């Protein structure tokens, strides 16, 4: 059984039920620990929730991750969430940038900031409010870099340098930044958003940049320590030593969506370094299909070459891949529910599927690149966007990531 919880941050001052109130014989006693000076506190509004939707991450491996978004629909028959209703407890507090956190069985699902309160009035004196929310990437997208003149440094140091800028001022406790393996150019930057520049850093690293489900900024270097799969999404309910979750839907594709026979890369140096490589055999089979990126920050030409090779060996052939898998949380037991809610972008899972129940089964390790939730009272669905794991870290002695003679040694 899944129990969603939605909490919103308000500063109600003296109206806070547990807040200190001057001259009150109960709430105004000095040195008490029950009634405290209020400030912004989280208030549980779960009893009003009609639906919750969340979308984080991306749907294609070569896309960049933009701001995660969420939408929460609440019962508003009593006008509690009407910004013009002066008698409402939250009057004066219903403004953008209020913090919201969404949990399920006390597991974090989404942490973001209010963008809009959209009111809808329905026949029969019914009313709802839809709260639109974006994660902290929304703020970074609106934070222009005034001027940055960095030294040549590793990608992780560059991420921290940007986050430390006065115009960004990202808290130390809300970041998890790995060191990085790519040396970046010392070129001056101005007039671009902090998010756009950080995404360029991540692409140059061949890493991963996202906001976690509990609101932290995460930067993973390439070849970051890889989790070995301990969860299988399957259409087979046979007992297993590994946690197995029955999916309700799986989407698989095979074709040219991510097929590139030529890779063209360049950095943004004053005299750009350029790399163009091609798999001529693949071009003969599929024609010229070019992936190009001329906005990279890599300083070392050899590093550009390695990145191009990594991209080519990954995408120079059509791949059968699982694009997404959906589970119905209402149908899972407590162990399965906790395992699903614990998954995060970058985690590795295994998908086991027998099409039309005609053997043999298809079994592939995949990396999670996106997570979406669509929860209503009748049914609560969670969908994971997937990247086929044909390129990643080689893990010695791992049954899935330790196979010899494959392309997963990376660089």
Regions flagged by a language model, labelled:
Residues 141, 159-189:
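N-terminal export/assembly leaders
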Residues 73, 103, 132-134, 350-352, ...:
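Residue-level recognition of well-ordered beta-strand positions that form the cores
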Residues 124-144, 377-399:
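Short solvent-exposed strand/turn elements
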Residues 1-46, 152, 196-378, 390-411:
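Acidic, small/polar-enriched beta strand-loop surface segments
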Residues 74-78, 133-138, 189, 219-228, ...:
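Secondary-structure transition/turn motif
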Residues 1-153, 185-206, 241-246, 329-332:
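Assembly/oligomerization scaffold segments
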Residues 109, 168-170, 362:
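Helix N-cap/coil-helix junction residues
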Residues 68, 110, 127-129, 215, ...:
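Envelope-exposed proteins and targeting segments
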